[in-house]
């Protein structure tokens, strides 16, 4: 596909921001040649077949409640698609949305050159194909024999911190004989052994599962206990919108010696409430990051909150927003001094996709970890070193399927 054709399919401002760098918005000759070579390689391949399946991810333990939701279980059965070309290349990834939605548009991909659907320095070229967004990134990496982070511009990936997102209200389980805070500390020790040096604690027990005062005190006690037991770890907290702003300041008053790395979703975001929280933490001398945008994100409101410096970290889900859309969003966040940490809960696959997004584009303050094993996917290429997640240098996302689809 000619360069002018795929540029025409994009919003010009996004295309120019992605394709052009440096003084005078001029691409280097090397970049132009590399782009042309990659496009030619992708044009040799046509989409021949799309297949669907699932992969089972297994958590190392039962994951319990959060402020709003009941037990999260032992791991999801993730819907995936595999995209095969007429030259025998195959890429795969989680579906964005349902299989039914994907099947309704798959005919728009069949028979097309990969270069008609995907450009390495852009991502997918038609938003209608977002169901296959991540799989097309993997496929392009396989064809070009490059890891996805290299498609995004880095020979060696940026690396960033990696936190355990596995610490829920497991002190409340089993319901007939709750294990108490010792269970939380046991889980933190396990996660520390995995390699995490950041631990995210779910809080908000008084929203639904305990009387408010009792739940608030348990949140405070858990936070203080974990911070004391793991002094070399960053502590993050996530309220899942289970507080009011006044209730949340009560929580902060109960943990004066804990230096929180970030505060996530203490309440459903509004300008007034985040202004009140920002004013409080500033007056109290609390240095922490405010992170939001996961649950039912309102893009216009989030934009306002970031522009007003009321939020620091954007959390919208890596699959929900889409990999290509995250590529578009990242420079916009940088313009307002904000950082990213795409929501990845549920599937370790999403953590690993995020490692490539962060590896190629940086500006990612930490990555959500969802500790898992799988008999269906080879996850061994990814490593945790010094508390950071290191993606592999193999093609695509570097996760070979161990099952046929």
Task: Specify the residue positions occupied by each region the protein language model found.
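N-terminal secretory signal peptides
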Residues: 1-2
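Shared catalytic-loop signature of beta/alpha-barrel
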Residues: 259, 270-395
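Metal- or metallocofactor-binding catalytic centers and their adjacent structured scaffolds
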Residues: 44-53, 83-147
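Conserved, mostly hydrophobic/aromatic
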Residues: 88, 145, 263, 305, ...
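N-terminal export signals
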Residues: 5-30
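C-terminal segment of N-terminal export signals and the immediately downstream linker at the start
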Residues: 21-61
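Metal-dependent enolase-superfamily TIM-barrel catalytic cores that perform enediolate-based chemistry
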Residues: 159, 164-276
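Glycine-rich, aromatic-flanked loop segments that form ligand/cofactor-binding clefts
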Residues: 133-174
